[in-house]
Amino acid sequence: TFSDNIANSLVEKGSAYTVTVEPFMINSVGTIANGVFAELITQVVQRVFAKKRRRNIIIEALNMHMMGAAALDNVLEIYPKEIGDTRIGAMVDCEIYHVNNIVAKVLVNVQLT
C-alpha cells in the first residue's frame, strides 16, 4: 500500500531518520506532497514510541510548518525529539532538514494507548 511504500523508504540513522524523495512522493509542482509529508512524520513518530516505550499511539494533532521545498531525489533528514509527556499523552517535535537547511518543522500531539 501507499503507507508501506513510504515506511519502506525510511532509513534509521542513529536518532534520525533519512528518506530520499522518490517520484511517487511528489505533487504536480515537483515538490513533496503534503500527504506524503504527513505520512512520513506519522511513521517516524510511531517508530520512536514503538522503540522507546513499546506502546501504540494515536495521533491527535499534527501541526506542520513548511519553511522550504523538497524536490525529487532530495535526501531528507528527520530529527524527532520528545518535548513533553504525561501518563496518557506526549508531544513530539520533528525537524526536517535537507543539506543542513531546514525544510519543515512539525509538532505532533499523541495519545498513548
Task: Name the predicted role of every residue range.
Residues 18-20, 63-65, 79-81, 95, ...:
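Residue-level recognition of well-ordered beta-strand positions that form the cores
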Residues 6-8, 52, 61-67, 107-113:
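A general structural signal for short secondary-structure boundary/capping elements
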Residues 1-24:
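Non-catalytic linker/capping segments at the edges of enzyme domains
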Residues 12-18, 61, 75-77, 91, ...:
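Intrinsic-disorder/low-complexity, polar/charged segments enriched in Ser/Thr/Lys/Arg/Asp/Glu/Gln
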Residues 16-43, 51:
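A conserved, well-ordered hydrophobic junction motif at loop->secondary-structure transitions
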Residues 29, 45-76, 82:
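Hydrophobic beta-strand-centered segment that forms part of the acyl-chain substrate-binding groove
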Residues 70-72, 83-113:
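HotDog/MaoC-like acyl-thioester-processing domains
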